[in-house]
Amino acid sequence: MSTSSSDPFFNFTKSSFRSAAAQKASATSLPPLPGPDKKVPGMDIKYDVVIVGSGPIGCTYARELVEAGYKVAMFDIGEIDSGLKIGAHKKNTVEYQKNIDKFVNVIQGQLMSVSVPVNTLVIDTLSPTSWQASSFFVRNGSNPEQDPLRNLSGQAVTRVVGGMSTHWTCATPRFDREQRPLLVKDDQDADDAEWDRLYTKAESYFKTGTDQFKESIRHNLVLNKLAEEYKGQRDFQQIPLAATRRSPTFVEWSSANTVFDLQNRPNTDAPNERFNLFPAVACERVVRNTSNSEIESLHIHDLISGDRFEIKADVFVLTAGAVHNAQLLVNSGFGQLGRPDPANPPQLLPSLGSYITEQSLVFCQTVMSTELIDSVKSDMIIRGNPGDLGYSVTYTPGAETNKHPDWWNEKVKNHMMQHQEDPLPIPFEDPEPQVTTLFQPSHPWHTQIHRDAFSYGAVQQSIDSRLIVDWRFFGRTEPKEENKLWFSDKITDTYNMPQPTFDFRFPAGRTSKEAEDMMTDMCVMSAKIGGFLPGSLPQFMEPGLVLHLGGTHRMGFDEQEDKCCVNTDSRVFGFKNLFLGGCGNIPTAYGANPTLTAMSLAIKSCEYIKNNFTPSPFTDQAE
């Protein structure tokens, strides 16, 4: 923490000091829930199922189990900030769909960095009367134990009800065989069938489709050009998207709310269902029984009142994300608190936080070529000049010589006539491109060729965004034991939980070679659409910026042989009633967006729960 050997903090990280959070990591001394006359509104003495986290995976568990008759409570550290529909996508507003670049600020405002190395910059211009630290500060996300050379510097979390689904891209591709974990051993056909069954159901929950942008001029412009350039070599299609087109100018993007309406139940629409959502509640630990065979309760901290309670349930499901699932487990006595010590492995879940993966990411932006833009109006018959009295734009509907369908030509004609001041023939409200060539063994990376909002890549107002195409290629990373996520026994995060720390490097060999090949592929492909936008030349982005962290609590068939934490039903090994959901379960090297796969695993997990746990009887009394 300090660079000076004379400073009292110089050897702090090697000291025997343990933070208050670390000292309480296995504490079980919380008071019981308050009685029915004093309980938090909606909070019951005992639930059938408790779910931690309200993102799409938590909502998958909620939907499956609430509809099956279970009494379910869901706790989330974040608050409701998405409007009338709890956990809805914030891009579902006309303002952002008219100007996607404005949504970048929404994303940036939602993301909280996981681990930030301390800033070693010394401010030596302070007044002599001002207090000056002799060591580095530990607030504002700073982590003195984070090696900046082994960090996932772009890794961040979203703490709101609905999680990252309130601002995600909604890309929901299926994994192919190379990316998927096995669910059925020694029978590839049966495994394929099982994944197809689960994927189909997950897609129905998310409303995944591949035709929402079929009548976008820009989309077809990019799609057709790439299909022509790579004919016989690569297949191009729309990105599979969790979204529903409501009109030619408005798309409803799916989110946690799409999967499950987070309104409390019973209610008018669901009089026979039982569900309660508790926002702004930090879940601090699960309490194990004396034989380490099941979980007895969950300790929660109401962040508004400051009160702490113990929640009882038959089943406990953690879906708080790849970082916070592991954090909660470590704070409960699983894995190892503090810097990993290979000579002293933990007894419970020794692989927790090991073999983590995160995708490499290359990015650039191009400005569409003159050739492409001119081709937009290739079927138009233009007379005169814009603004002239005799100016007209027409086309011949249904003509065999037309290069574009009538819907395309009608849009172009109307725009060129109604907006003669616009030098571009593309309508102002033309939907953005959403193109991909999917992950394949010959090019093992996922591609998103589109125009969307991320925490980076906003376009200057001096450039018309209709001309811009974003290129994001995602590479897979081989799981390696030395790549770890661990939690400090000395430093705590903003919520007084053990501070997450990364020990990660992209592995040499296949992972690194594929990343270079992916960069070359993006450069060559993007040049076929146009020239690079100044300031957005091809580049590798910060590790972790993809936000697809995986493998923190890996899935497998055997805990020891597969170095994993949960089985294929997402149940923690050795515990009959503790389940983990999310991308942290995925143990493989994957390049595609993992959310649909994580949801599929959650559906399978729910099937196990329904087969092994019985819902409590429903009563007519208010629950």
Curated annotation (Swiss-Prot):
Pfam families: GMC_oxred_C (PF05199). The active site is at residues 548, 593. Residues 28-38 form a propeptide. It catalyses: D-glucose + O2 = 2-dehydro-D-glucose + H2O2. It is found in: Periplasm. Its cofactor is FAD. Not glycosylated. Its EC number is 1.1.3.10. It is an enzyme of class 1 (oxidoreductase). One of its GO terms (cellular component) is periplasmic space. Keywords: FAD, Flavoprotein, Oxidoreductase, Periplasm, Signal. Substrate binds at residues 448, 450. Binds 1 FAD covalently per subunit. InterPro entries: FAD/NAD-bd_sf (IPR036188), GMC_OxRtase_C (IPR007867), P2OX (IPR012814), P2Ox-like (IPR051473). GO terms for molecular function: flavin adenine dinucleotide binding; pyranose oxidase activity. The modification Tele-8alpha-FAD histidine is found at residue 167. The keyword Phosphoprotein does not apply. Optimum pH is about 6.5. Active from pH 5 to 9. Stable from pH 3 to 11. Belongs to the GMC oxidoreductase family. PANTHER family: PYRANOSE 2-OXIDASE. Homotetramer. Catalyzes the oxidation of various aldopyranoses and disaccharides on carbon-2 to the corresponding 2-keto sugars concomitant with the reduction of O(2) to H(2)O(2). Plays an important role in lignin degradation of wood rot fungi by supplying the essential cosubstrate H(2)O(2) for the ligninolytic peroxidases, lignin peroxidase and manganese-dependent peroxidase. The preferred substrate is D-glucose which is converted to 2-dehydro-D-glucose. This is Pyranose 2-oxidase. It comes from Trametes versicolor. The lineage of its organism: Eukaryota, Fungi, Dikarya, Basidiomycota, Agaricomycotina.
